[in-house]
């Protein structure tokens, strides 16, 4: 069987679908990944994938560039002749679905979060919605990572109800992200935010909450981990972060290929995002490692937290509300914090174990008669 995955970064394919890829390759699937080249392209090749570069303008609507993207995908599909295609993220979902239809190949579209499409009600947003409505007539199914996104598409009549499938996130590897004892570094309590350094991720609210909390709790440490060099109009530059460090309100930890040691030293994972998330992977990873979560009562984010049991939900774009949640956490006893983290791990095990996500992929491929091999992991 030949299978193609298309996304806007090789990084996302490697990091978010690593276990799925391993299982597909183990079952003898000939797997192609089509995405803009980055340092993770080579890692995918090492795994056994055939990787093809796909120049793409990830943001904005440029009819000529987007037509070129669709034609490049159509050429790849006709050359590869795959049995099935899986598209991720906005432009591959739209233009890849159209190219797959023209090539006569069945496909699956997976919406990994709606980003700005339904947040900014402008001309670009309206065009994107109409493109979705046209393109999503053609995939066999469209998967949504949370019920809010699925409901929006149905309410706007952008998709037929029988094609809209709820996935509940892309899952987390529970054997890779496991609870571990926190290193006894000192008596400080560490709040950790892991994300690209974008304003939409609530980074500024995190910093303002840190200012408020540290006036009364000097043992509260606020840490930032993530890339500040991404091409995005919402990005926070290194200079601004350096000013926050100089002020003494946050520590910037840079980037890493393995977040587990940094999660292990934290007491609480925080993501005050107002971006239209799918299901934030960093929150799933933190909860899987038995860390309590503080996040916004926002699309995707709220799905990962049982408010008051596994963490706390704060108001969107409200640093004071976030600070109150942080203070509430600080007043818990050690045993209460541990119980909250343990409850979070149990919640992730019940709802976000990636093995059930992989099972759904295999069931779908068998449903459309493009995969006959048994997946022994679930037999």
Identify the residue ranges that each predicted region occupies.
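Donor nucleotide-sugar binding/catalytic pocket of nucleotide-sugar-dependent glycosyltransferases
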Residues: 52, 133-179
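Short His-centered aromatic/hydrophobic patch
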Residues: 87-93, 111
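Conserved donor-binding/catalytic core segment of Leloir-type glycosyltransferases
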Residues: 183-201, 207-210, 223
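Nucleotide-activated donor-binding/catalytic signature segment of Leloir-type glycosyltransferases, i.e.
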Residues: 226, 235-255
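Acidic donor-binding loop of glycosyltransferase active sites
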Residues: 264-278, 291
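Short hydrophobic beta-strand element within catalytic cores of glycosyltransferases
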Residues: 292-295, 305
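Conserved acidic donor-binding segment of nucleotide-sugar-dependent glycosyltransferases
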Residues: 306-308, 312-319, 328-334
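A short, well-ordered alpha-helix in the C-terminal region of glycosyltransferases
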Residues: 321, 328, 335-351, 357-363
């Amino acid at each position: 069987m030949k299978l193609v995955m298309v996304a806007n970064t090789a990084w996302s394919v490697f990091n978010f679908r690593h276990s799925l890829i391993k299982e597909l390759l183990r079952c003898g699937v000939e797997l192609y990944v089509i995405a803009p080249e980055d340092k993770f392209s080579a890692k995918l090749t090492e795994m056994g994938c055939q990787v093809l570069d796909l120049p793409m303008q990830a943001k904005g609507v440029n009819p000529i560039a987007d037509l070129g993207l669709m034609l490049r995908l159509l050429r790849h599909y006709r050359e590869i002749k795959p049995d099935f295609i899986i598209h991720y993220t906005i432009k591959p979902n739209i233009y890849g679905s159209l190219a797959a239809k023209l090539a006569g190949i069945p496909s699956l579209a997976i919406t990994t979060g709606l980003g700005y499409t339904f947040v900014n009600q402008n001309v670009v947003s309206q065009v994107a919605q109409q493109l979705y409505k046209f393109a999503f007539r053609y995939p066999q199914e469209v998967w949504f990572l949370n019920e809010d996104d699925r409901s929006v598409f149905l309410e706007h009549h952008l998709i037929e109800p029988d094609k809209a499938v709820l996935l509940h996130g892309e899952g987390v590897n529970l054997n890779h992200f496991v609870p571990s004892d926190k290193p006894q570094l000192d008596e400080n309590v560490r709040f950790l935010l892991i994300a690209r350094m974008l304003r939409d991720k609530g980074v500024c609210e995190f910093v303002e909450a840190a200012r408020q909390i540290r006036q009364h709790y000097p043992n509260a440490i606020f840490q930032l981990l993530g890339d500040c060099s991404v091409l995005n109009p919402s990005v926070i530059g290194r200079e601004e972060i350096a000013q926050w460090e100089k002020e003494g309100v946050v520590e910037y930890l840079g980037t890493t290929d393995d977040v587990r040691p940094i999660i292990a030293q934290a007491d609480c994972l925080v993501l005050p995002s107002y971006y239209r998330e799918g299901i934030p992977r960093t929150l799933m990873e933190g909860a899987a490692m038995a860390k309590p979560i503080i996040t916004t009562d926002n699309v995707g984010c709220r799905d990962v937290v049982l408010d008051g049991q596994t963490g706390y939900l704060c108001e969107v774009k409200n640093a004071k509300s976030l600070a109150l949640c942080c203070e509430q956490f600080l007043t818990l006893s050690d045993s209460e914090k541990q119980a909250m983290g343990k409850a979070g791990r149990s919640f992730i095990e019940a709802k976000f174990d990636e093995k059930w996500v992989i099972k759904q992929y295999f069931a779908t491929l068998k449903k459309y008669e493009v995969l006959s091999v048994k997946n022994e992991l679930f037999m």
